Amino acid sequence: MPRPFIEQNVTWLYSDDLDTHAAFYRDVLELPQVLDQGVCRVFQVSPTGFLGVCNKEGRPRGTKGMMVTFLVENVEETYRYLLGKGVEFDGPPNMLGGRTVYSAFFKDPIGYWLEIQEFNDPRWPYPPGRGPRRG
């Protein structure tokens, strides 16, 4: 039997301050909020990818061991845009992984690590019409 197709995915982050956490993704990163469940809010990251922030009883605690990476078409452009929105980065964009990854890191208001990233690897399943930008 073949593996059933996975249509969409949601990454969940947990918070003690749901309003501040949700406002960052809605107002700073400008992700459209697609669902408000009261204790959880869900934002659309891409046509099939979603990010949820939650404050509910019995939830996992802490931000270590978790990072969300947003693959973007142009890291420098996104970096400048987010700087203009007040985002504080860990440093400027940098080439990593033997020149296969170009990225910059920052934290959301709760302390989760976030990354904006471009892959520079022809093996990556790029969106239609795209491929590595960097030589």
Where would I find each of the regions flagged by the language model?
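Conserved catalytic-core motifs of GNAT/GCN5-like acyltransferases
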Residues: P32-Q37, N94-G97, E118-W124
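A generic structural signal for short beta-strands and their flanking turns/coil linkers
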Residues: V39, G49, K64-M66, K85
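N-terminal beta-strand motif that seeds the catalytic metal site of vicinal oxygen chelate
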Residues: M1-D19, M66-V68, N120-G135
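Short beta->alpha transition motifs characteristic of CBS
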Residues: C54, F105, I116-R123
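A short local loop/turn or secondary-structure capping micro-motif enriched for an aromatic residue
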Residues: G52, R59-G62, P122-P125
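Short, charged/polar, Gly/Pro-enriched secondary-structure boundary elements
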Residues: G49-V53, P60, G111-W113
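Vicinal oxygen chelate
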Residues: D17-L18, V68-W113
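Core segments of cupin and vicinal oxygen chelate
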Residues: W12-L51
